[in-house]
Amino acid sequence: MRRLFTSESVTEGHPDKMCDQISDAILDAILTKDPNARVACETCTTTGLVMVMGEISTNCYVDIPKVVRETVREIGYDRAKYGFDCDTCSVMTTIDEQSADIAMGVDEALESKKGQKDEVEAVGAGDQGMMFGFATNETDAYMPLPIYMAHKLSRRLTEVRKDGTLDYLRPDGKTQVTVEYENNKPKRIDTIVISTQHGEEVSLEKIEKDIKEYVINAVVPTELLDSETRYFINPTGRFVVGGPQGDSGLTGRKIIVDTYGGYGRHGGGAFSGKDSTKVDRSAAYAARWVAKNLVAAGIADKLEIQLAYAIGVAKPVSIEIETFGTGKMPEDKIVEIVENVFDLRPGAIIRDLDLRKPIFKQTAAYGHFGRTDLDLPWERLNKIEEIKKYI
């Protein structure tokens, strides 16, 4: 059976991704000084303006406007002709403390209030909700090929801009990859779409030629391309106005780019700007950790796990496994393995994945999962042998 599946990525200069990076840069700056801080930091941006808002409870001081400007500078918006200037943009902040009603459930979980006293039980989930984790063995990164290749292309777009290879490129950009599957195995790349912001002086013909040579051919394996592969490079013909000048940006608006490109399900909660007591983030990371280790252990070729939590309660209210017909054992047995091998209470997730550290800004562009360029705790294959004891 033949089918097509498409996923997209965006560069760090995309306005939504700018906001994700600013929110996580602020989170990291706070965690560096106060690892136990509670942070829920949202950012929005438009022409000449960055606004930071949210709820932050901490005992430290962070110069938020300075963090904002440094982050925007690193992305590459450092002069007016790019449509946004880190030195002259306006930065507004409006920050409150975390609600006392929420804090009381996170500070002491329901289990702890009922007498189950230990350090892990003391941390309740920061909200209700469901989170999904996914892994597949179709790539070495245990990620679906469409999102994996889309991220590689968007990262390469930024590399050739920053190292001067294509110095006419600007920070904003998007990529999209359509993969043809045959019998549920990736066979070839059917379509590649790349839209990149550029200087006014360069022709579309040069952009098309350079993007194929320095971006696509540099990262896409030749065996995945053929004479039928279609390329759409800046298909509107012009992309000079970009970044916050072209579109407003908002934290948490690229949640599918952040995860599995639509190949796996998503619970709806965004990651950036949230400390690890927020299960939207920490439990989604744990779910990826579980799924990746299960697939690497040979439990299934493709696996998705759903976790669900109640606010103020430590233990998940449900765990569900889907193997899409690739499992080597019944799914209820896999759930038992998960319960025996992984402690999925928020306090245990924070402990086992070391999530009090300021490691989040680096995840805020090019995906939180399958990052072979980073050493992220939830990507480590450190539970395989323990899982195999139950097979």
From Swiss-Prot:
Recorded catalytic activity of this chain's protein: L-methionine + ATP + H2O = S-adenosyl-L-methionine + phosphate + diphosphate
Listed under GO cellular component are:
cytoplasm
List locations, semicolon-separated.
Cytoplasm
Q: Tell me which cofactor or cofactors this protein depends on.
A: Mg(2+); K(+)
Q: Which GO terms fall under molecular function for this chain's record? A: ATP binding; magnesium ion binding; methionine adenosyltransferase activity
Residue sites binding K(+) per the record: 42
Does Zinc-finger appear among the keywords?
no
**Free-text remark on how the cofactor is bound:** Binds 2 divalent ions per subunit.
Binding, Mg(2+): 16
- Its primary localisation, in coarse terms, equals cytoplasm
Domain of life, per the record? Bacteria
Enzyme class comes to: transferase
Question: Might you give the EC number(s) for this enzyme?
Answer: 2.5.1.6
Q: Pfam families recorded for this chain? A: S-AdoMet_synt_C (PF02773), S-AdoMet_synt_M (PF02772), S-AdoMet_synt_N (PF00438)
**Keywords for this protein:** ATP-binding, Cytoplasm, Magnesium, Metal-binding, Nucleotide-binding, One-carbon metabolism, Potassium, Transferase
Tell me the first and last residues of the signal peptide.
none
Q: Which residues bind L-methionine?
A: 55, 98, 247, 278
PANTHER family tied to this protein: S-ADENOSYLMETHIONINE SYNTHETASE
Sequence similarity:
Belongs to the AdoMet synthase family.
Tell me, in a sentence or two, what this protein's role is: Catalyzes the formation of S-adenosylmethionine (AdoMet) from methionine and ATP. The overall synthetic reaction is composed of two sequential steps, AdoMet formation and the subsequent tripolyphosphate hydrolysis which occurs prior to release of AdoMet from the enzyme.
Query: What HAMAP family would the database entry show?
Result: S_AdoMet_synth1 (MF_00086)
Instruction: Provide the assembly information.
Output: Homotetramer; dimer of dimers.
What is the protein name stated in its UniProt record?
Answer: S-adenosylmethionine synthase
Q: Which organism is it from?
A: Clostridium botulinum (strain Eklund 17B / Type B)
Coding gene? metK
